[in-house]
């Protein structure tokens, strides 16, 4: 998951696997020498830490524990909402609940979707939400923001929805509950 610094630039990437990495994956991470972006200069990554969550001294904030989490990058629903028998199905809120059950094995007590104004204030509209070519983005091009509240604190990282493996749908723990 890419994480931006205070200026909004990605300055590090956290690679996370809930079940850990096998020896071949560790070798692949250790052998990564150069990254290239479209029209940019190469970046030379450095592996800083490798290990279990409980043994690492400093973890990125996204690995924190909280009962409240909120969107850092836009949540893109993996499915399009639809109307079946006069009832709206697969709303962004319903998909977040479903993904929490599937991915986290926890269902939030509440899912508070951000208003379009709040999502815009948080900069969620600045992300590219359409493919350059090929099939359209699942769930439509709308980017959503949300705040999740769980019954008990859970540990991150949390990334849900379309493109979660590329840094979309990332949530951060909320420490200060005075929103």
Model feature map: region roles:
Residues 1-179:
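RNA-interacting cores
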């Amino acid at each position: 998951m890419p994480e931006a610094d205070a200026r909004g630039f990605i300055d590090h990437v956290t690679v996370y696997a809930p079940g850990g990495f096998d020896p071949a994956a560790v070798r692949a991470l250790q052998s990564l020498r150069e990254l290239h972006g479209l029209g940019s200069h190469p970046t030379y990554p450095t592996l800083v830490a490798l290990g279990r969550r409980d043994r690492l001294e400093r973890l990125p904030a996204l690995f924190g524990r909280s009962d409240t989490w909120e969107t850092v990058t836009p949540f893109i629903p993996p499915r399009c909402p639809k109307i079946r028998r006069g009832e709206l199905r697969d709303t962004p809120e319903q998909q977040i609940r479903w993904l929490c059950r599937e991915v986290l094995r926890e269902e939030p007590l509440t899912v508070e979707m951000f208003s379009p104004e709040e999502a815009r204030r948080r900069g969620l509209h600045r992300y590219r939400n359409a493919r350059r070519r090929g099939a359209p983005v699942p769930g439509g091009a709308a980017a959503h923001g949300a705040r999740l509240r769980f019954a008990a604190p859970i540990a991150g990282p949390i990334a849900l929805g379309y493109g979660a493996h590329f840094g979309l749908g990332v949530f951060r723990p909320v420490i200060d509950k005075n929103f």
